[in-house]
Curated annotation (Swiss-Prot):
Family indicated by similarity: Belongs to the universal ribosomal protein uL18 family.
Protein name, per record: Large ribosomal subunit protein uL18
HAMAP family named in the record: Ribosomal_uL18_B
Function: This is one of the proteins that bind and probably mediate the attachment of the 5S RNA into the large ribosomal subunit, where it forms part of the central protuberance.
Family annotation (SUPFAM superfamilies): Translational machinery components
Species for this entry: Roseobacter denitrificans (strain ATCC 33942 / OCh 114)
Amino acid sequence: MANSKRQLFIKRRLRVRNKLRKVNAGRVRLSVHRSNKNISVQLIDDVAGKTLASASTLEKDLGVVGKNNIEAAAKVGAAIAERAKKAGVSEAYFDRGGFLFHGKVKAVAEAAREGGLKI
């Protein structure tokens, strides 16, 4: 029986995350989630099991509420880079999950790099 799109997405997400964990043990993870309406990003310390910082298009401070485009993704990336500095994080590895590194996901990564976060 053929796998559904959702099942393939979950397999891809787990495959990507497991490969990243093997290589980047002990480092902070920059995790991206993209939905049809919003983008959210978290800095996660997997060793402690805590979220150090987060940013989303749902936040009114960013001025992009309800927008899901590349410009909004870039603002979220810049915001997470700024919050990472406040949390004392200068380096993280990028976890794209099951999403392709293209468009909005790529815009988040590039804006975070421009903001001073080493990815």
